[in-house]
Every structure is written in C-alpha cells, then in structure tokens.
Amino acid sequence: MQHESPIIRRKSTRIYVGDVPIGDGAPIAVQSMTNTRTTDVEATVAQIRALEKVGADIVRVSVPTMDAAEAFKLIKQQVSVPLVADIHFDYRIALKVAEYGVDCLRINPGNIGNEERIRSVVDCARDKNIPIRIGVNGGSLEKDLQMKYGEPTPEALVESAMRHVDHLDRLNFDQFKVSVKASDVFLAVDSYRLLAKQIDQPLHLGITEAGGARAGAVKSSVGLGMLLAEGIGDTLRISLAADPVEEIKVGFDILKSLRIRSRGINFIACPSCSRQEFDVINTVNALEERLEDIITPMDVSIIGCVVNGPGEAEVSHLGLAGSNKKSAFYEDGKRQKERFDNDDLVNQLEAKIRAKASVLDQANRIDIKQED
C-alpha cells in the first residue's frame, strides 16, 4: 500500500511555470526536453504530446534562432503542457518568445549581453509573469572561474550561479529557480547541497549528460536520489541519450521509489527462480507495457511462488502468489476465492488492475495542480 514519505523537504519560495506550482512544498515537477529540430513544428508538437501522455509536467524546448522562435509560436498554440524556452546569447529571442506565451525562460543572465539587455529581458518577464531558470553547467563555466578553480568544483558552480542570482537580485526579480548540473554525480550533489544553503529559491535537479538509457538512469537515480532523500529539489529532469519519453518514466520511478510522488503502478516483482510457477519476467513486462496509460498510484505485487508471494500481496492493493497451475489472487491484502489460470495471467491481471484503478480514482486522472 502507499505510505507517506519520511523525507522533510527543504523550504523554498513558490513560483509558477504556467499553472504548475514549483517550490514551497508543491509536488516535485518532472520535466524533459525535446530533441527535435524546433523549426520542425510537426515533429516537435508530436514529441511534446508524447511526453505529456506519460506525465510530463513541463517540457523545455531549445530556441536558438529567430526562426525557431517563430516555430515556437506555432508549437505553443498546439500543446497544453507548460513550455520552457531554452535561450542563449541573443536576448531578442527571449523577448520574442515572451510575446508568444512562453511559460518560463531558461537563460543565464551573464551570457545574453550587457546590463541593459538583461534588464530588458527581466522587465519583460516581470510584466508577463514569466519565471526564469538560471541554468549552470559544469561543462560551460565562465573562463575566469575555470582559471580560478582549475576545474569544475562545487564552489565554482555555485559561484557562477550566484553571479546570475545577483543579476536578478539587483533588478528586484525573485521569480526564478536555479540548477547547477554536472555529469559527475558527486560534483552535482555537492554543488546542489552548497547552493541549497545559500538561497531560498526552488532548485531544478539534474545530472547533465548522464549517458544512455541504462547507465544514465542509474547515474541519475544515484545522484538525484541522494539529494531528494535530503529534501533538496523542486523540479527534476533525467538527462538521457535516449527517447525523452524515457526521461519522464525514470523521473517518476525515482520519486515513486522515495515515496515522494506516486504516479501509475508500482510493480513489486520477484527476480524469479526455479520456484516460480509462472513466467514472472514476461508477465511483468507485458503488464508494464499494456498499463502505461494508468496513472492512478497503486501497488501490484507479482511473485512467482508461495514463499514471499502472500506476504507481499498482503501489503499491496492487488497481489498474485504463484501456485501450481492456478495462482492465488489478493485484493487489499485479503486472499480472494478466485484463482488465476497461470496460462492467462496477463489478461486476467490487466482487467483486475484497470478495475481497481477506476475504483481508486474514478476520474482516472491525477495532476500536479490537484496534488498541491
């Protein structure tokens, strides 16, 4: 069954990205970034919709040129999830996407020009209630900080971040969040820990350039898991060299494992051994694929034998304990009279899980605004 997380989250200020609350105890938002050419409006819209389907709260889109800004206008008109525009160097692009309804600007004040240009972007953001994300990356530190520290260090990343924070402070702008990403787990974790002691603004978590689907998921889980367990973090992105949809899935799996935010089915399944009375691995894989559309939080245990099966089933919403030819079925911790044919488990379990999801959440829709 679902249990409350023991984690006490860091206190932070509240901002809004579109209608998604960030910080001050709001549910941790999961986001990704498109990897299509932004000027390919059709492909970008399709990818954003795919991300939204698996639960993305926010989607970031790179806007490197004015042509991309014009494409962003068309993209924004066709999607409902809040969009962050990722902008570097040309402050005029930030002003343009602000006209087109962007929900958040990802910039570094230090790389978009002089004080006058920074002020024009900040004034525009203030007038239109658009928050800003300051994004510091260990791979693109300012040259003077590289010279000062010799290599990326937590102190270097945080000093870079605080420079940008000071820019916004001087302009009396406080609607922003900050990230200090690095590809090294310990560098990223120590940077976020240090930054969390210095500012009250929301923190966006990420291990940048984490790697492919498997290695990147592991690295991100280790790094973000440490921070989240300490209560640090208000939004997150899992950076994978893979389909962005996988980033959202991994992000929710991390939050689910820490009992911070649950979305969809939490499958409790044994790794299988010679005691299994049915094919556990293929059963779980098939159910995960079939039930991706279920977002109602629930625990489903699928254990191939009677050694651990009953115990896990008794603390799950639904449970299966393998037995010869027919397996025992549990609901809300109680063994039911009906037994499931081991040759047709996937179809039988899918029907039961869908019915249970409907009971647990009649609307079959939980969103971050309602969770707040």
Swiss-Prot record:
Top-level EC class: oxidoreductase
MF (Gene Ontology): 4 iron, 4 sulfur cluster binding; 4-hydroxy-3-methylbut-2-en-1-yl diphosphate synthase activity (ferredoxin); 4-hydroxy-3-methylbut-2-enyl-diphosphate synthase activity (flavodoxin); iron ion binding
Flavoprotein recorded as keyword: no
EC assignment: 1.17.7.3
Cofactors (names): [4Fe-4S] cluster
The record's free-text note on cofactor binding: Binds 1 [4Fe-4S] cluster.
InterPro entries membership: Dihydropteroate_synth-like_sf, IspG_bac, IspG_bac-typ, NO2/SO3_Rdtase_4Fe4S_sf
Function: Converts 2C-methyl-D-erythritol 2,4-cyclodiphosphate (ME-2,4cPP) into 1-hydroxy-2-methyl-2-(E)-butenyl 4-diphosphate.
NCBIfam families for the chain: ispG_gcpE, PRK00366.1
Protein name (database record): 4-hydroxy-3-methylbut-2-en-1-yl diphosphate synthase (flavodoxin)
Species this chain originates from: Vibrio campbellii (strain ATCC BAA-1116)
